[in-house]
C-alpha cells in the first residue's frame, strides 16, 4: 500500500480549482461541499510548498495558491473571512488576495471552511529567513568594520532602518484597512473595564502557569542551560511583583491614560503576527499572509476583536527572537564574533524604534482612535501583550526547544524593565 498526501496531488488540486471556477457543489452523505470563485485561475500546474505550515499549501500555476485546512472547526476560518474582507472591501494590496473558497455545509446547518484559493505572491522568502540572513551578515561583516549598528545595517537589506520602517508602515496600513471594514464580525468596539480585566486575568493565568513550569524545569538537572536556569530564577523572583501590579490595577491606571483618552479601539487583527507571516517581494515590498490566528486557540477567540497592540507586540517579539537566534549562531559557530552579541542586541533596540516609527507614522495621520494618545499609555499597552507573548513562548520552548528557553526569558525581563513591572 502506498499513501500519498492527496492535498498536494495534482488531480486533487485541479478538481478543487475546477469546482471553484464553476461554483460547483459536491453532495456528501450528511451535507454538501460548496465551492465558490472570486476570479479563479485556469491552466495551472501544481508545485508543493516546503515550509512549516499547519495546513497543506500548493502553488497552482504562477498566479494561484490553494490551501487545504487540515484541522476543521465549525465556522468560517478567519483566514478565509479576513482575507476575503480585505480583498473585497478594502484597497489594501499587501496581501495574497482571495480568489475562491471551499466549505462544507452539514445537514445540521453548521458550515466548515475546507479550502481557500489565493493569488500566489512572487517572493524571495519570508521575513524571518531574510532577516536572519541579514543579521548574520551584520555580525560577520558590519560589526567588525562599522561602529554603529544602524550604519552597519544599512547594507544588510531587511535589517536596515528603511526596511524595518517600511514593514512597520505595512502593518499600520493593515490595521487601518481592518478597522475600516463594515461587515458583521468586523468594525470597532470600545475597550471597557471588562476588557481590561480580561487582559489582566489572561496575562496572570498565562504567567502563573509558565512560572510553575519553570519551577518544574529547574528541578530537572541539566534540562535548562546555565544561562536559561539563571534567567528562569530571575523571572520566578519577579513574578510576585508582576502579580501584585496586576492585582492592584497599576497597569490599568497607566494604560488608560489616567482616564483621559482610553485605551484605543478593538478591531479584527491578524492574531498571530510574526516575521514568518510576512513575505518579501523581489522589489522589497512586503505581503502579509495567514490570517488564521493562533491555530490552537478556539475559533471564537480567534474571531474576537482585539487591540492592534497585540499584533504590534507579536512583531516586536519576533524581532527579539531574530536578534537572539542570530546571537546564538554568532557565539556557537566558531567564527570570530567579538562584539557581535552586543551589536545584535543594540540592533534589536533600534529595530523596535524603527518599526514603531513606521507604524505610527502611518496610523497617527489617518486614525486618532486606534491607540491611546499618550506615549506612556501606548508603551504600557504594548508591554502587556509583549510579556503575555513571551510567557507563551516560554511554555513553547520548554516543551519543544529547551535550548532556546533563554530567548523568551530574556524578553520577559527586558519587558519588565521597560514596563516597570516590579512596582507594587
Segments (PLM) and residue ranges:
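A generic "structured core" feature
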Residues: 111, 224-230, 238, 245, ...
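Conserved catalytic-loop position in the HRD/HxD motif
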Residues: 272
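Conserved ATP-binding subdomain of kinase catalytic cores across diverse folds
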Residues: 1-212, 283-285, 289, 293-345, ...
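Acidic, serine/threonine- and proline-rich low-complexity regulatory regions
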Residues: 252-262, 297, 301, 366-381
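ATP/Mg2+ or Mg2+-diphosphate-binding catalytic cores
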Residues: 230, 333-334, 338, 342-376, ...
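An alpha-helical support segment within catalytic cores of ATP-dependent transferases
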Residues: 30-44, 210-268
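Hydrophobic residue at the +6 position relative to the catalytic HRD Asp in the kinase catalytic loop
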Residues: 278-280
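Structured alpha-helical bundle/scaffold domains in large eukaryotic membrane-trafficking regulators
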Residues: 183-186, 215, 219, 327-331, ...
Amino acid at each position: 500500500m502506498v499513501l500519498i498526501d492527496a492535498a498536494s496531488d495534482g488531480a486533487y488540486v485541479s478538481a478543487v480549482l475546477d469546482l471553484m471556477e464553476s461554483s460547483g457543489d459536491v453532495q456528501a452523505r450528511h451535507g454538501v461541499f460548496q465551492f465558490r470563485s472570486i476570479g479563479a485561475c485556469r491552466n495551472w500546474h501544481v508545485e508543493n510548498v516546503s515550509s512549516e505550515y499547519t495546513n497543506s499549501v500548493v502553488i497552482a500555476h504562477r498566479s494561484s495558491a490553494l490551501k487545504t485546512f487540515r484541522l476543521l472547526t465549525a465556522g468560517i476560518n478567519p483566514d478565509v473571512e479576513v482575507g476575503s474582507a480585505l480583498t473585497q472591501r478594502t484597497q489594501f494590496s499587501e496581501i495574497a488576495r482571495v480568489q475562491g473558497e471551499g466549505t462544507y455545509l452539514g445537514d445540521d446547518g453548521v458550515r466548515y471552511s475546507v479550502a481557500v484559493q489565493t493569488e500566489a505572491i512572487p517572493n524571495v522568502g519570508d521575513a524571518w529567513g531574510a532577516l536572519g540572513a541579514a543579521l548574520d551578515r551584520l555580525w560577520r561583516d558590519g560589526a567588525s568594520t562599522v561602529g554603529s549598528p544602524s550604519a552597519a545595517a544599512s547594507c544588510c537589506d531587511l535589517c536596515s532602518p528603511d526596511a524595518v520602517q517600511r514593514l512597520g508602515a505595512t502593518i499600520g496600513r493593515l490595521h487601518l484597512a481592518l478597522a475600516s471594514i463594515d461587515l458583521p464580525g468586523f468594525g470597532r468596539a470600545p475597550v471597557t473595564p471588562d476588557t481590561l480585566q480580561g487582559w489582566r486575568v489572561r496575562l496572570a493565568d498565562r504567567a502563573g502557569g509558565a512560572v510553575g513550569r519553570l519551577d518544574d524545569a529547574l528541578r530537572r538537572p541539566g534540562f535548562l542551560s546555565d544561562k536559561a536556569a539563571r534567567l528562569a530564577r530571575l523571572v520566578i523572583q519577579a513574578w510576585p511583583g508582576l502579580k501584585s501590579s496586576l492585582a492592584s490595577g497599576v497597569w490599568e491606571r497607566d494604560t488608560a491614560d489616567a482616564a483621559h483618552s482610553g485605551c484605543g479601539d478593538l478591531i479584527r487583527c491578524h492574531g498571530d503576527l510574526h516575521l514568518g507571516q510576512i513575505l518579501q517581494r523581489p522589489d522589497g515590498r512586503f505581503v502579509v499572509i495567514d490570517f488564521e490566528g493562533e491555530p490552537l486557540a478556539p475559533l471564537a477567540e480567534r474571531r474576537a476583536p482585539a487591540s492592534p497592540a497585540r499584533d504590534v507586540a507579536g512583531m516586536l517579539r519576533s524581532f527579539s527572537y531574530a536578534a537572539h537566534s542570530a546571537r546564538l549562531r554568532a557565539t556557537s559557530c566558531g567564527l570570530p564574533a567579538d562584539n557581535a552579541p552586543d551589536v545584535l542586541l543594540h540592533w534589536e533596540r533600534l529595530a523596535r524604534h524603527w518599526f514603531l516609527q513606521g507604524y505610527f507614522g502611518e496610523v497617527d495621520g489617518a486614525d486618532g482612535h486606534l491607540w491611546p494618545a499618550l506615549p506612556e499609555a501606548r508603551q504600557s499597552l504594548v508591554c502587556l501583550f509583549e510579556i503575555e507573548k513571551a510567557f507563551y513562548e516560554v511554555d513553547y520552548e520548554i516543551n519543544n526547544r529547551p535550548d532556546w528557553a533563554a530567548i523568551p526569558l530574556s524578553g520577559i525581563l527586558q519587558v519588565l524593565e521597560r514596563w516597570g513591572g516590579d512596582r507594587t
